[in-house]
Amino acid sequence: RNYLETERKNISDGLVIELPVKKKTSEQSEDELKPRVECRPDGVYWVTPKVDKQSGEIIRPCEWIGDRMRTVGIGHDGCDGYLIIELEPEGMEKIIYEAMPRNEIGLPSGWSRLRGRGVAVTTSQKLLNKLAEYLQREGERTQWEVTSTAGWHCGAYVMPDGEIIGVPERPVAFCGGSAAIKGYVVRGTADEWRDNVASLMRGNHSMMLGVLVGLAAPLNSLVGGGCFGVHLFAQSSAGKTTTVEAATSLYGDPEVLKLSWDATRYGLTVEAAARNDGFIPIDEIGQGGRINDIAQSAYSLFNGVGRIQGRKDGGNRAVIRWRIAALSTGEEDFETFLIKGGVTPKAGQLVRLLSVPFIDTTVFNGYDDGDQHARAIKRFASNYCGAAGREWIGWLSANKELAVSVVNEKENIWLSRLPENASPQVKRVASRFAMLDAAGELATGITGWTTGESHAAT
């Protein structure tokens, strides 16, 4: 009676009463015996629960479907829809995110895509169908930015292998792909690269300049710069290829990431888009194909815009665009190379790919001769690669305003040294070297070089 009186008083006072409700236990759940796909720490499984006839307990036999994966978002690149799938490939210590086109889910092309990313997936068609349903119907539906080009997106930097550096304003997924994706590895630390690679280049201005081109690549895009490159030329082979490998080791394995002028024009532009806002190393222009083809490739590469292409289902594909900084080498300057091949160079080509004489390496930094010195740099560039460039990009991501300010300051200094009647082409060249100068000053913590040493290299 006292209880009822108390409750009536609470109701009259406007209080909300929580009546005791008997909740279902997990054993009484209606869905407990429902077959399902489960994502576990060691993979994805098809689970078919059933009641054991003898014990009456529920047992959970399961079949393996693949490595651990789950849908964490959705996105659209302006043409196609995507599911963002979080992957944990066997043997890898990092999580990767794959933007899988919705029209590939459940098809051989989709499973091939996952396997190409290092993910193990069953060959059973029955289980693949279950996996396709799981990816489409379960998981999160957070909106992601989907891009087919690497580089700066939403305030963060997307590496050509899909790795995100920095903190994006919203989640970003990469749906493109570099032909050299396996080259974007990390071996050693940024400090080891500085102490073993950059330190051996000290005092050799042409070698240092090559590294500055690599460092300028992600910086160039932050300030809205266009595509450009530096072509180091000399009759001798004293250090040009070594320089390219050292610069390339900023971002990954030099042997895998290095390109050739023998590639097709379309191939180079697709690779440029995949490495957008990044570094393009192209060794020995004299080893390429026909000179006219190389001239066309160079023009397309530094133009920064791909060709319009039609879609199979009608209409046109989105035009691909890119910004890159390239490092090329050869025995002759680019203009002479073209003229000897019967090609009249365009002014725009020469301004975008700047020919700079390569000064022979003379400072061996503890080694007896140039051969020992070059071999050491090649060895260390392979052993300690990828970390320094990522640390540099991470620093840029956290210090964008400072980086832009230093570039603008350097550009004003370089332009102030020109005659008043300097041509627009000359001013553009000065702006390129101002960019390299700024990269050297900002990246002293990466290279270990002083600002004076970096400035002297430009």
Briefly describe each language-model feature range:
Residues 208, 217-392:
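Conserved NTP-binding/hydrolysis core of motor NTPases
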Residues 175-184, 196-203, 258-268, 310-313, ...:
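Active-site-adjacent structural elements in folded domains
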Residues 1-23, 412-414, 419-432, 437-457:
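Modules that initiate DNA replication and primer synthesis
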